[in-house]
Amino acid sequence: MIFVISPAKALDYETPPVTARFTTPDFLDDAAELIDILRTCTPADIAGLMSLSDKLASLNVARYATWSRPFAPDNAKQAILAFNGDVYEGLAATTLGEDGLAWAQDHLRILSGLYGVLRPLDLMQPYRLEMGTRLSNPRGKDLYAFWGERITTELNRLLDLERAAGREAVLVNLASEEYFKSVKPKLLKGRLVTPTFEDWKDGRYKIISFYAKRARGLMSRYAIERQLDEVEDLKAFDSDGYAFVAEASDEHSWVFRRRQD
């Protein structure tokens, strides 16, 4: 079973990492190609392209300028510890321990506009490049064209490894719609399950972005702590009061709901 999650805009490069273990991203050559394109952009270009303030645009232009290989612990940080948004609050990776991080390294992947696919312990340098950015490049008009089938091919490689190990070849999609558009479901060599998280508000259940993002991190942690092999075991997920609702779910879309009165 393989899980995919989205990255975060917020980054933490101040807190020391809780592990000395690290790996290097598989798609660094592709990332370097994108960095070369981004280095041709002015702060005004970046502000317009990414809808950023002048201050944030200048920060990211500086990041592109200083981005350099090779990655090492003194100039980069493990991805699962560097991202700092709602998903990562739920995941709380700093308290997973070495065993948890090791399991996550094999079963969890972070989709990235710049790095393509990241393992949790892959070192990364700070950046801002959301998957939906319409950055023109030699492969097409945007990042979906740039990554093409590369991300899907990598996920299929992982699903093949799961199958070879006698485990279920299932991809659990805990990424946002923007990021999962970089995956081509029809080409996946395994079952796809997409959990959704709904909260009760104004007389009905609905997806509330902040809570849903955090729940994706909570479910990732739930699987990591239990080292789950069977996707059916995810139906027992009950963190923060969520519960699986069979009548609202189907084979591929699993609904979890919470009502806080």
Swiss-Prot record:
GO terms for biological process: response to hydroperoxide. It comes from the Bacteria. GO terms for cellular component: cytosol. Belongs to the UPF0246 family. NCBIfam families: PRK02101.1-1, PRK02101.1-3. This is UPF0246 protein azo1887. It comes from Azoarcus sp. (strain BH72).
